């Protein structure tokens, strides 16, 4: 075999290796930019994982994992998962594939503060997770307290 076809094959593999993560990054940015927004009521707590560090674990008011979750909104504008969610692609409506909302990664020094803030919130304060959804793909945009991103809320209140 000549060296030219081997080089071409090697170049093709290199290009494919760049295209795969490039596509994943593009899909996430596309979902964040043009996806439909859904707010999920949550209550965080701060676990520690020696491999992942600190993060904010979330207790969603909804069940936290669905293969295909058909999303709707309640009267207050918060996301509810349709009782028709299943293991098959839905025929209509906005859906998220493999929806799992159980953690939100943030700066390690902020995670314990976020938990303390959550404990001190009054019943009038609102905490929610903002999720963008497009064609079955979802991306967590942020954790919010009273419509303020939690990172900004922490820096202004501590």
Model-derived features: where do they sit?
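Short extracytoplasmic
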Residues: 41-70
């Amino acid at each position: 075999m000549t060296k030219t076809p081997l080089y071409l094959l090697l170049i093709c593999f290199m290009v494919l290796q760049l295209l795969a993560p490039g596509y994943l990054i593009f899909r996430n940015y596309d979902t964040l930019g043009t996806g439909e927004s859904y707010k999920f009521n949550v209550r965080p707590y701060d676990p520690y994982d020696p491999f992942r560090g600190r993060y904010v674990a979330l207790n969603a008011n909804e069940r936290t994992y669905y293969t295909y979750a058909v999303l709707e909104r309640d009267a207050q504008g918060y996301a509810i998962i349709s009782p028709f969610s299943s293991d098959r692609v839905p025929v209509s409506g906005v859906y998220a594939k493999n929806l799992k909302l159980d953690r939100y990664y943030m700066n390690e020094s902020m995670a314990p503060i976020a938990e303390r803030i959550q404990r001190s919130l009054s019943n009038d304060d609102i905490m929610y997770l903002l999720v963008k959804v497009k064609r079955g793909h979802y991306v967590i945009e942020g954790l919010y307290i009273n419509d303020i991103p939690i990172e900004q809320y922490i820096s202004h209140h501590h």
